[in-house]
Amino acid sequence: MTDRTKSAAGIVLLTLASGQFLMTLDSSVMNVSIAQVAEDLGTTVTGIQTAITLYTLVMATLMITGGKIGSLIGRRRAFMIGCVIYAAGSLTTSLAPTLTVLIIGWSFLEGIGAALIMPAIVALVASNFPPEGRPRAYGLVASAGAIAVAAGPLIGGFVTTNWTWRYVFAGEVVVVAAILMLTRRIQDAPPEAKHRLDLVGAALTAAGLGLAVYGVLRSGEWGWIQPKPGGPEWLGISPTVWFILAGALIIRIFFAWEARVVASGREPLVRIEMLRNAQLNGGLTMFFFQFMIQAGIFFTVPLFLSVALGLTALETGVRLLPLSVALLLTAVAIPKYRPQAAPRTVVRWGLIALLAGVVSLVAALEVGVGPEIVAVPMLLTGLGVGALASQLGAVTVSAVPDKETGEVGGLQNTMTNLGASLGTALAGSILIAALTTSFIQGIEDNPDVPPEVSSGAEVQLAGGIPFVSNAQLEAALAEANVPSAQAEAILAENEQARINGLRASLSVLAVFVVMALYFTRLIPMEPVGTTSGIPAEV
């Protein structure tokens, strides 16, 4: 490869990685700026959380359709149209005077733009890099997204603390403009022959995925199976179950519809035969587990640092830097220095490193520890996620012909969104359940807490207690005129309950890492840059 060719490839990679970084940055920034955004817009924290939920929902429901649109009109064109829509959403968000305008700009416009951009990125990497160069390219693009999750609190905290959260979204408009200027250097994948978009299939996927994801996102409020006290219920069961079942039923109808479309000679939204491809299934399954575990970690660790230890958003971001650095270096180094490494072996070692990071953090969590305990676990986690990022993108795309990479991009991003939604919801619900159980048991057994107080707390807090800092709890106890001896006992029990909740949540994530190890058998042993043909179906 000549220096000029290397320079062109570098620009393409920078452009696509920047797009991936932006798509992931928003939620991370918004999560650390919720209070400031709510105050600025004159709304509540619940209102901002609704906007976050809708953003995830729009992306998850439209990813498959966005991938197919890219296949029909051209991936670069879809990428550019998505960037324009995304920039319009960012500008609207930066100027939003009310929650309604924020939802229009951020949740809907940015969500629609992301649904066009992210599948196109997957396909454009395939059309701009030879098979042997794709693992490194996909690794860098994937690491850009993961780093955005880790860097979001750092960027959001710094900008929000020193200026205003609006500058983050205004800055995104400038970045998108730069990305659009560089897209002329990107080689487009030729679009498919002109077909009509399968609108019925698009509606079915949007409805099915939307219902399932919405049920998962509301599980913390509704409960998973047993409804929470005072919460809604249908036939004595939490609505979460019904939403997920309804979504699964509609997805089953979608598969039947797609088979009918193929039988009639029309172009389907998704070629169902692709899902019988063992290698593709393996890659998609690993993406699901990676993002579920990754999202759970990015939910629990910042909570520990910011709430339990009282660190600022900026300080929290700094403590996550070992993960970001290790992730980036690993994602780049493995394809560069071990290009012939077996993908299955790399993925397995990545999961082992990820497991070691989670387990070591569980072991280190104690009342009274400082923020330094997360350094080694975050380093190990970064090594693990980086190893996965270096392989999975190339594994999924190499499983199909290049003309189908747009559809694979839609499927891949659907699985990552589902995984991230489920990971955050599971981590949060398990943490609150364990925190509540531990706290109630603790004050019942504590001799400094009168029986009437502990029994009253058991009734009032049965639906779950919030994960609050010592300062927040002290203020609440002082306002309630709780005697100092009782207040100190309650504070001590809350500290221990917080740690127990974090341990429980992380322990469940460790179990999912072990489960993911089982499915690595679907990942090929032969380096994907050297494979020829399409793997056997199952």
PLM regions: where:
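Flexible interhelical linker loops that connect adjacent transmembrane helices
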Residues: 2-3, 180-209, 222-236, 260-278, ...
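C-terminal module of multi-pass small-molecule transporters
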Residues: 73-88, 92, 96-104, 117-123, ...
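Transmembrane-helix exit segments and adjacent C-terminal regions of multi-pass membrane proteins
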Residues: 1-16, 20, 260, 279, ...
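C-terminal membrane-cytosol helix-exit motif in multi-pass small-molecule transporters
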Residues: 173-191, 208-221, 246-262, 517-524
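Small-residue (Gly/Pro/Ala) motifs that create kinks and tight helix-helix packing interfaces
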Residues: 34, 148-160, 334, 423, ...
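Helix-loop-helix hairpins in multi-pass membrane proteins, especially solute transporters
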Residues: 71-209, 218, 227, 235, ...
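Transmembrane core module of solute transporters
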Residues: 9-59, 63, 164, 235-242, ...
